[in-house]
Every structure is written in structure tokens, then in C-alpha cells.
Amino acid sequence: METPSQRRATRSGAQASSTPLSPTRITRLQEKEDLQELNDRLAVYIDRVRSLETENAGLRLRITESEEVVSREVSGIKSAYEAELGDARKTLDSVAKERARLQLELSKVREEFKELKARNTKKEGDLMAAQARLKDLEALLNSKEAALSTALSEKRTLEGELHDLRGQVAKLEAALGEAKKQLQDEMLRRVDAENRLQTLKEELDFQKNIYSEELRETKRRHETRLVEIDNGKQREFESRLADALQDLRAQHEDQVEQYKKELEKTYSAKLDNARQSAERNSNLVGAAHEELQQSRIRIDSLSAQLSQLQKQLAAKEAKLRDLEDSLARERDTSRRLLADKEREMAEMRARMQQQLDEYQELLDIKLALDMEIHAYRKLLEGEEERLRLSPSPTSQRSRGRASSHSSQTQSGGSVTKKRKLESSESRSSFSQHARTSGRVAVEEVDEEGKFVRLRNKSNEDQSMGNWQIKRQNGDDPLLTYRFPPKFTLKAGQVVTIWAAGAGATHSPPADLVWKSQNTWGCGNSLRTALINSTGEEVAMRKLVRSVTMIEDDEDEDGDDLLHHHHGSHGSSSGDPAEYNLRSRTVLCGTCGQPADKASASSSGAQVGGSISSGSSASSVTVTRSYRSVGGSGGGSFGDNLVTRSYLLGNSRPRTQSPQNCSIM
């Protein structure tokens, strides 16, 4: 369906296409079309305004009905507010009295704390003196043990030398016996040779006698034969016989002479050998006698030294036993004194901690009550302003007190606010991750970079020569510590590697000091790795710091609560039936048990609140729930529940065990 403007545009276009128009005609037609378009837009706007006026009339009727419903509920709500305001005034008076009592108790606790601190300082001085005396005695014991070990090593050395000398004496005695035996053998051989020489001489004489006898017998036979031979040949035979006898005699004499020379030569050689052997044996026997004499002299001197060392060792052992007994008595006395002082210090610390915890608990409760009263006052003032109620003289006086209290709280030099709250607070925590693949684990890493502690978790000793500990702190340079070459960590033992700036004493194998490094480093990401001699990572521990910033100002909390209250009014189109009620619940930060301090007296109002105290940053968390009444509801409260949390800081650390919990 075409609109009038579209039809007019169609007709004008047709006319323009049929007949040519002048510029003035064209201008008038355009103005006419503009006026027609504006008239159409005005008609549409008037229709829209009429429809909006109709809707506005319906809305005014609904608002009138809602105001009538709310006006019927104002009386009940006013009575509930007045009852709760009376309870708040009573609570404020009791809190003021409790505050005065707590201030008196705080002064007493401070005096007791000063006295206990002075006594603790004195006890710590006595403890330091006892520890210094114990260290001196331990140093004396170490020196005596070193002297004893030196004497024992010298004794073992002398015993070894004595054993060697005894072995040498035994060898020399054996050599002397062998030399004597050889001398006796040589003497026997000499006597045997002399006997043989005598025998040979006798045999030679006997042979000479035999030869002479044979010669005479031969002569006699020849003579007998010569007698028988005829006289013609006697001369020939005699000459031949003489020649033969001469030849035979010459041969016998040559043989005897040769045999005699050989016998004399053999005898002379054997006699020379026997004489040389006897001389050698006599020289060996003399040297053996001299060595034996020297060995006996040395053995006597070593025996005298050994007896003297044994006497010294016995005296040292007796003195060592006396020193050990005295050291044991000193240790027992020091242990008893140290145990007594530690028990007294523990009792004093327990009493101080208990008093501080009680004071901290009371201070937290008082702080929560002050916040609740301040929030009540802000809410009541807002409701009175919204409902245009005239405040009673009592409420004016309480408002005056509240304003004076807020001015005191807002003053920069207020001691109470400085004690209660800090402008901001940071809470840091460490998360650890450890990994172990060998016998030794990284048990503990100091957050301030003072030490690194390792533990041998196995049942066997672990040699850690040339092992390394590598420390990485974010993007900082890598720190590397190398163990001594002969270091060994016993089974189940712990070794602590201290930085030079920690002030620890170097006492291996339990405590080692890294003298070239003042600190292990501290930061937000600490990674400590244990590397063995082959370069393999056998253990690791990583610390990551997380920091939480807490903004906690009492006035800001009250203002936020008041702004939330007025914002609720604005969002509900100024509904006078909207209000906030709450109750309070105090929770113990350690054991988690609730302690009911107040309850809401309004029927149908269900409000939750909690106060918890953290153990690390000692921050108080106040959680409140608000139930708001809707504008279209009947005589009951609304169903919209709003929960808000407030963080209040306290710079004093607080640790409390469940046994000392004031709530339990």
C-alpha cells in the first residue's frame, strides 16, 4: 500500500516526464514535498505521544496502588527499626565499657610482657654463656682426641717397625746359622781333603815299595833267566835287559811324577777353595755378628721407647677418661640447665602467646562490633532520610556520637585507628614442588636464602664428592655450590649448606658453610637442583611466591555499604519500603567454630554475617548478607539476597592453636 507522499512523488514524476518544468516550479514542488514529509512525521510523533501518555496513565495508577501498599507497611517496619536501634544502643554502651576494660587489661599485659621480656633476655644470656662453655669443652675434647689419635698412630708405627726388626733379626739369625753350617761343612771337607792327601801319600809310598819290590823280583827273575841262558848271549841279554829296565824305570818315574804333580795341583786347588770359603764365611759371620749386635741394640732402644710410649699412652688414657668424665658431667649439667631454661622460655612464650591471642581475639571482636554499629547507623540514617522521618533526640545524640567517632577515626594521628587498621596489606604465600630420583633429597630451602638442607633417605651411605647444588632465582645468574671431593652423607643423616651471611659455624659433615657466597638468593621463583658427579639431576625443589594485596579501610567499607544502600533505592524507583537488616556471626580463624554474638530481632529477616581471622596476615574478613524488599511485594520481605564481603587488615601476626582457642 502506497503512502500519500509516495503517491505524490509518483504523480510528480509522471508529470515531469510528460511536460518539462521550469526551475521555479521544481523548487516549489520540492518545498511542498518537504512540508508534506514533515507533516507525516509530526502525525507519527503525535500518535506515539498519545500512546505513551496512555501507558503513563496506567503506570501512574500502578504507582499509586504500590504507594498505598507501602504506606500500610511503614508502621510495622518503623517498629522493627526502633527495636533494632534500641538493641544497637545497648550493644554500643556495652562495647564502650568492654573497650575501657580491655584498655586496662592491655596496659597490664604490656607491663607483664616487658617483665617477661627482661627475664627472657637474662635467660638467653645465661643460655649463650652455657653454650659458649659447651663449645670450649667440645674444642678441648677434640684437641685431646687428636692428641690421642696421634699417639695411637705413633704406637702403631713403632709396633710395625718393631715387627719389621724382629723379622730382620730372625732372617739374620737364619743367615748366621746357615753360615755356621757352611763353615762346618767346609771344615769337614778340609779334614776330608787332608785325610785323602795323607791316604794318597801313603798309597804313593806303597806304590813305590811295590815298584821297587817288583823291580827286585824282575831283576831276580832276569838274573835267574840270565843264568840259564848260555854264556854266549849273556852280554847281549844283559845290555838289552839293562836298556829295558832303564826304559821301564824311566816310564815308571815319569808316571809317578805326573801323578804326583796332578795330586798336588788338585790338593792345592781344593785347599785354596776351602781357604777362600773359610775366609768368606768368617767375613759373613763377622758382619752377621755386627748386624745382630746392632739389631739387639736397636731392639733394646725401641723396647725402651715402646715402654715409655705405653706409659705415656696409659697416662693419656687415664687423663682422657678423667676429661671424658668431667665433660660428661658438664654436658649433663649443661643439658639440665638448658632444659630448665628452655622449659621456662617455653612457658613464658606460651603465656605471652596466650595473652596476645586473647587480646587479639578481643580486639578483632571489638573491631567487628564497631563496624557493625557504624553500618547500622549509616543504614538507619539513610532510611530516615528516605522515609523523611524526623529523628528522635536519642538518635540525634547517637548521630552526634557517631560523627565525633568518625571524625576521630578519620584523623591521621588517631592511635586507635592505627592499632586497628592499616591502609593496605599484602599477604604472601609459598607453594612448593619437590622431585627426587635418588637417595638424597632436597628437604628444605630457606625463603630468605640462608641455607639449603639435604637428607639421605636411604639405608646406605652416599658419596657426594664433586656433586653440585644449582640455585636459580628467576632471571638472576645461576648459583653453583660444589661439594668437597671426599664428602660422604651417611644413611638417614642431614647436611645443611649455609650461606656466609647466615652466621653459621662450619662443622662438617652436618653443617657446611659456603664462604664465597653471602646468600643463596631470595625472590618469587626459587629453583634448587642437586646434580651428581655425572651431571644428572637427582633431586629438585621449587618455591613460588604468590602475593595478595588487601585493601582494608574502615571508612571506605562504611561508605561502600552506604552507597550500596542508596543505589538500591535508586534502582527501585524510590520505593520507600526497601530496607536492610543483618545479624553477625564470629568464626574462629583456627578451629572454625562459630560464636553467636548477636541475632536479628526482626521477623522474617534472614541475614548472615561472619568474621574470620587469618593466621598468616591476621586479616579480618566480615561477610554480610542483605535481604531487600521488592516494590511490588505484599506484607512480607523480598526474596533478593545480596552478599558482600569486607576485608579488615591487622599488621600483627597471630597464631593460635585449637587448644587455646577462646571460643572452644
Curated annotation (Swiss-Prot):
Disordered as annotated region, ranges: 1-24, 384-442, 555-577, 598-620
Record's protein name: Prelamin-A/C
In-chain residues carrying the UniProt-annotated modification Cysteine methyl ester: 661
Modified residues (N-acetylmethionine): 1
Record domain LTD: where: 428-545
Cross-link Glycyl lysine isopeptide (Lys-Gly) (interchain with G-Cter in SUMO) per UniProt, renumbered positions: 201
Family annotation (PROSITE patterns): IF_ROD_1, IF_ROD_2, LTD
